[in-house]
Amino acid sequence: MAPRARRRRQLPAPLLALCVLLVPLQVTLQVTPPCTQERHYEHLGRCCSRCEPGKYLSSKCTPTSDSVCLPCGPDEYLDTWNEEDKCLLHKVCDAGKALVAVDPGNHTAPRRCACTAGYHWNSDCECCRRNTECAPGFGAQHPLQLNKDTVCTPCLLGFFSDVFSSTDKCKPWTNCTLLGKLEAHQGTTESDVVCSSSMTLRRPPKEAQAYLPSLIVLLLFISVVVVAAIIFGVYYRKGGKALTANLWNWVNDACSSLSGNKESSGDRCAGSHSATSSQQEVCEGILLMTREEKMVPEDGAGVCGPVCAAGGPWAEVRDSRTFTLVSEVETQGDLSRKIPTEDEYTDRPSQPSTGSLLLIQQGSKSIPPFQEPLEVGENDSLSQCFTGTESTVDSEGCDFTEPPSRTDSMPVSPEKHLTKEIEGDSCLPWVVSSNSTDGYTGSGNTPGEDHEPFPGSLKCGPLPQCAYSMGFPSEAAASMAEAGVRPQDRADERGASGSGSSPSDQPPASGNVTGNSNSTFISSGQVMNFKGDIIVVYVSQTSQEGPGSAEPESEPVGRPVQEETLAHRDSFAGTAPRFPDVCATGAGLQEQGAPRQKDGTSRPVQEQGGAQTSLHTQGSGQCAE
């Protein structure tokens, strides 16, 4: 390094003097700068100053003065250094063209106009146009730019847009958990999430909704049934029991009527079958009886008539003169026949008979309960004399010769109940067989209805006077038919004689008279009123004429009778089935051909120790002496 320093030479003196002269020249060049283009302009060989922003150049510079500048007026502006002789005007923002002043401007800055919201500036037409609207599921991209069209973007997961808009962006789904609710439906890009309250149940499925109407109808039906059952129970408790009882009675009556119709047809068939029986069966001990008193002859020839005249089974019983009056065995029970009660009185017509009165000889199965006549005192009870009510041990006082019988045949008129006393021995032409043309089978008109006398009727020995036949007329009825007297006239005559209105036919009765429309007793002893099936009266010759009298009194004594009004003949009530009162007619026990004694008095019913003249009183299915 030292050798190099030694090689440096000093400047010569002339150079140093030149440098001293040049230094002041350098200082002068730096004090006077040159003319620039931005703020100066060159005029007359010199640089002049320009006007600043907001002013304009009023006059240029001179060699002795600089440029003169003035400020801009209202709505004018100049935003740069200028040498302009005037200012610029601001723009006008027209609202009709959807323009709005964004910056009003000043002297140094211009005014700026922009399109209103929903419009954008189109440089092609220098005007504002409407922005594009985004469809549901799309949203406008933010931030929105002025004077620019809307940019639509699809909504992301968790966001949705459900409207058409050029400014709305996609909105997020509602968070149901933050609201304290349950999510009912999940959201989409076009719809939000549906939230429900925690107490609100979810909507039932469609299947449950389909069964809901059926369930409602079933509940309504059950309610109606329950209400109806309650109403019926209350009504049945108050008055429904009587209604139920009436309904059951009606059903029972209907069933009884149907059963009665069937059994009635069966009875008719049974009656037809019995009517076509052979002659051999008739002669085995069963004979039909007429309403006339018929006596069996000693030889028994008149019993069978033409059927058994030649002999046969009746040959063994020719010497028998006594027969018992019994009922024909019913082939079939007539359940439809109504049985009257004790306090029921009806006047309806009697029903057609299905049976017939028969005669069987003693010794057969039908044996009377009393083999010997019974006698009852004035103070004794007569209930023991009724068949079927008392035993035979207590019936010592009764005098029954023949048992009571019952028949289903109904008399046509009261005249057929009349009885009379017949003496003598003759045949019995009234006995017929089932195949005989003279017999009465119950299917046609009886001879008694035609009021024609029965030919060959003979008076025979003692037989029951209350014989209930199948329609053969009595001798009195035959005589009435021959004389041309109507049964009604005869009935009136009989009623008059029974009441004592005709003293010539019937002498006045002695003793006490008591009774009602159903029964009348004439006696000299204690008067008794009875209401029963059968009334048995025994009167002796001495009891009628009074004790201690050996000779008959001058005044004739009437026979004891039992009267019954014609209107109530078929309405006598008792515990037995309804049967006509054959022997209970008023005047039937008197007159009608009965023999009278020499002193004018009628013959008593039965004499103590006398002939066995039986008075059969046909009551409610029984006959008494």
From Swiss-Prot:
Keywords linked to the UniProt accession: Cell membrane, Disulfide bond, Glycoprotein, Membrane, Metal-binding, Phosphoprotein, Receptor, Repeat, Signal, Sodium, Transmembrane, Transmembrane helix
Signal peptide boundaries: 1-30
Region (Required for interaction with EEIG1 and osteoclast differentiation): 532-537
Pfam families the UniProt entry points to: RANK_CRD_2, TNFR_c6
SMART domains: TNFR
Compartment(s) of residence: Cell membrane; Membrane raft
CDD domains: TNFRSF11A
Record keyword Heme present: no
Compositionally biased residues, Basic and acidic residues: 561-571
Region (Disordered): 331-356, 388-413, 479-524, 542-625
Summary of the tissues where the protein is detected: Ubiquitous expression with high levels in trabecular bone, thymus, small intestine, lung, brain and kidney. Weakly expressed in spleen and bone marrow.
Membrane topology recorded in Swiss-Prot or TrEMBL: Single-pass type I membrane protein
Cellular compartments per GO CC: cell surface; cytosol; external side of plasma membrane; membrane raft
Protein task: Receptor for TNFSF11/RANKL/TRANCE/OPGL; essential for RANKL-mediated osteoclastogenesis. Its interaction with EEIG1 promotes osteoclastogenesis via facilitating the transcription of NFATC1 and activation of PLCG2. Involved in the regulation of interactions between T-cells and dendritic cells.
Protein name: Tumor necrosis factor receptor superfamily member 11A
Organism for this UniProt entry: Mus musculus
